[in-house]
Amino acid sequence: MEKWKTLESEYVFNRPWLTARRDKVMLPDGRINDEFYILEYPTWVNVIARTPDGRFVMVEQYRHGLDDIFVELCAGVVEEGETPLEGARRELAEETGYEGGNWSLQMVISGNPSVTNNLTYCFLADGVELRGKQHLDSTEDINVKLLTESELYGMLLRDEMKQALMAAPLWRYFAMKNCDAKTPGESETEKR
């Protein structure tokens, strides 16, 4: 299997939250595609945050794309100069006021690798505590919700988690918990 070769690139739309690029590419068999579009986004993060008593820190907010209100994981954009972990910690503190805990990377996923160029880093923050107030962006209106494990699992089973980049790490969390699997990077003695 060979990669495509990019012959030309041109930005056709460039805004703070969305950039569209048109590439002229050569496929491995020599065919040319003059118009292949890539959506460029910054790196994203999301956080499965649990309090010391085992409740999950979730955010409830309106999502204009689907014109509805959803309960989701805390998530956001990694700012320039930040690592994904730093961005995830900042987003959790800004959106919820929760901080601290033991952090581990759960997975790195792509929303659609055929037409987007970014990755989402999904973290587990275990043992977070309320230490401050929310510091929301101008377009954010977020309610913090604390859910039990069974309430969160029920949301997944009822298909209430519409954001695939949030559902995937949650399904993985529950799968690993239920099959006594290791978290990536854990030693054999650090099983859940």
Predicted regions and their residues:
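A glycine-rich, hydrophobic loop/mini-helix early in the fold
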Residues: 42-72
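Long hydrophobic alpha-helical segments typical of transmembrane helices together
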Residues: 153-192
